[in-house]
Design a protein with these regions (language model features):
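Hydrophobic/aromatic packing residues within the alpha-helices of TPR/SEL1-like helical repeat arrays
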Residues: 1-2, 40, 77
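Short solvent-exposed coil/turn linkers within tandem alpha-helical repeat scaffolds
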Residues: 4-14, 43-53, 81-93
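Repeat-based scaffolding regions
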Residues: 17-20, 31, 54-55, 59
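Specific register positions within alpha-helical solenoid repeats of the TPR/Sel1-like families, i.e.
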Residues: 20-27, 64-65, 98-99
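Residue-level signature for tetratricopeptide repeat
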Residues: 25-26, 46, 63, 83
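TPR-repeat structural position
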Residues: 32-33, 70
Length: 100
């Protein structure tokens, strides 16, 4: 008989957390590259309600804005305010909506 490895749910949480942290590291060290955006997207897919969801979405919005992708940043701002109306990045999201 073969043993079946059972992966505890925490392991998956750690993997998604790592995706967020890698995005943040890339964002802070390289000024918001597409690589950072891909890590944030991966985190948001894997853990849409995770501990870092608000920060990942907010950082994605700010990175897009810094990159001049204002239409995309505005879409993320609307999503951010719907999900996290009093979140850390709400103050940055509101002007992006007004600029639509």
């Amino acid at each position: 008989l073969h043993e079946v490895a059972i992966v505890p749910p925490q392991r998956h949480v750690r993997a998604s957390d790592a995706a967020f942290l890698l995005g943040r590291l890339e964002d802070e060290s390289n000024g918001g590259t597409d690589v950072a955006l891909r890590w944030y997207d991966r985190y948001l897919v894997e853990a849409p309600d995770g501990a870092y969801a608000s920060e990942a979405l907010g950082r994605k919005m700010m990175t897009l804005r810094r990159n001049g992708q204002l239409a995309e940043a505005s879409e993320i701002a609307a999503d951010y305010l719907r999900r996290f109306p009093t979140g850390t990045y709400a103050h940055a999201a509101r002007p992006l909506l007004r600029s639509r």
